[in-house]
Amino acid sequence: LVPHAVDGSRRALQKVLRLIHPQVLRYCRARIGGGRQPTAEDVAQEICLAVATSIGSYEDKGRPFMAYVYGIAFNKVTDAHRAMGRDKSTPTEEIPEDSARDATPEEWALEADGSNRMRALLDTLSDKAKNIVILRVFNGLSAEETAEIVGSTPGAVRVAQHRALAQLRKTLQAAQETAR
């Protein structure tokens, strides 16, 4: 499918974008979260646009196409974080676009609370460690694929993941002990 998109097939490109969008959005939500400007959905859209405009120059060098996509995603999320640092405005509450889901207000609140706690926990990590955990744990990439994206070796990715998960475990245990 990707080679056809690279060769200029609009239909193949549409299919590729439909396939990558959920994974890109999940990555953006884990890195950016909700209630901020730009939103995870905005950044995911920018990533898909960047993939669409650059796919013609993509060369298969033996690594998975998603490594190429996550490389673009990493850069776009980094740009969004920089923009958030410069933007001192306070956004208003956003209306969820996924209102078709049949969830009660209580379920929405619990889901948002869990996402916020996970995001706060991930924010205790360095940017590189957070990115490794998101790519390996949330997106299910291999150590090799993650290493390509973050510019490291697979061994260093495994070590960083182990240390990051240990740090998260320690932070979570400390939070649970203070809550008692």
Give short role names for the model-derived ranges.
Residues 95-123:
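Acidic, proline/glycine-rich intrinsically disordered inter-domain spacer in sigma factors
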Residues 23, 117-120, 130-131:
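Pre-recognition alpha-helix immediately N-terminal to the DNA-recognition helix
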Residues 42-49, 63-75:
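Structural recognition of an alpha-helix C-terminal capping motif at a helix-to-coil junction
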Residues 7-15, 25-46, 154, 178-180:
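Short, charged helix-capping/linker segments at alpha-helix termini
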Residues 30, 53-60, 71-92, 111:
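Arg/Lys-rich amphipathic alpha helix in sigma70-family domain 2
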Residues 129, 144, 148-177:
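DNA-recognition helix of helix-turn-helix
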Residues 132-136:
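A short pre-motif secondary-structure segment
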